[in-house]
């Protein structure tokens, strides 16, 4: 049997932000107001689960003191798809896809980033940020004989448009292995080791030729 869920999602976001340039001892205040509308849902079948969302945002960003070219009205469309497929008694396949399509070059607070613990793990947090892009992950998880402990191997990839006016893009890809321990409704621990696949160097910090390690911990209260 299968079970499906679908709902409308809508809301209003108001944010008061501040950009600090510590080197120059200056800061800029900015304000963002946005409406979003879309759908969220999931589908459960025999040995599978799929969750998804599609949200359209329309908003306006204003700066208090200066105009850096990214203020004004903007529109963007975000999608998220997460699929889990059971391949056997101890193996599951996890596929994640995230994307953003924007009408213009966006302020950094609205941009889409590829690198990081929840993105392409071979790259630093926030690496390769732009207004439009996608990021995908395919991961195999193996349940061990130790309760709540599993091993993983994964591939991450993605592309982002850095500047709409000149069509500048970056493509990143990486692979890695991980181990996680999860206590349902209590806490979650995970360690990942990742290396890049296409030789694309870091731009946000010095290159790390020996790979990258991430440690994540979540606690439910």
Q: What are these model-derived regions, one by one?
A:
Residues 16-149, 153-162, 206:
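C-terminal outer-membrane beta-barrel translocator/porin domains of Gram-negative envelope proteins
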Residues 15-24, 189, 193-212:
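Outer-membrane beta-barrel translocator/channel fold
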Residues 7-11, 53-55, 98, 190, ...:
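Soluble periplasmic/extracytoplasmic beta-strand elements of cell-envelope proteins
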Residues 137-139, 174-180:
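Short glycine-rich, acidic/polar surface loops and turns
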Residues 169-172:
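Glycine-rich, small/acidic residue-mixed loop/short-helix segments
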């Amino acid at each position: 049997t299968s079970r499906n869920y679908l709902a409308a999602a809508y809301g209003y976001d108001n944010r008061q932000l501040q950009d600090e340039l510590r080197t120059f001892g200056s800061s800029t205040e900015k304000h963002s107001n946005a409406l979003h509308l879309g759908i969220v849902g999931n589908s459960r079948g025999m040995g599978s689960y799929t969750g998804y969302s599609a949200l359209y945002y329309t908003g306006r960003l204003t700066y208090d003191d200066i105009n850096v070219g990214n203020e004004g009205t903007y529109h963007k469309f975000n999608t998220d798809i997460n699929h889990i497929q059971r391949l056997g008694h101890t193996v599951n396949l996890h596929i994640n896809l995230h994307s953003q399509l924007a009408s213009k070059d966006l302020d950094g607070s609205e941009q889409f980033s590829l690198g990081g613990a929840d993105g392409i793990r071979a790259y630093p947090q926030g690496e390769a940020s732009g207004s439009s892009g996608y990021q995908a992950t395919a991961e195999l998880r193996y349940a061990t004989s130790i309760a709540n402990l599993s091993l993983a191997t994964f591939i991450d990839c993605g592309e982002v448009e850095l500047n709409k006016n000149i069509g500048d893009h970056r493509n990143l890809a990486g692979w890695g292995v991980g181990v996680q321990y999860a206590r349902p409704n209590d806490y979650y621990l995970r360690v990942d080791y990742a290396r890049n696949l296409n030789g694309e160097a870091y731009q946000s910090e010095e290159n790390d030729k020996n790979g990258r390690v991430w440690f994540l911990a979540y606690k439910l209260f």
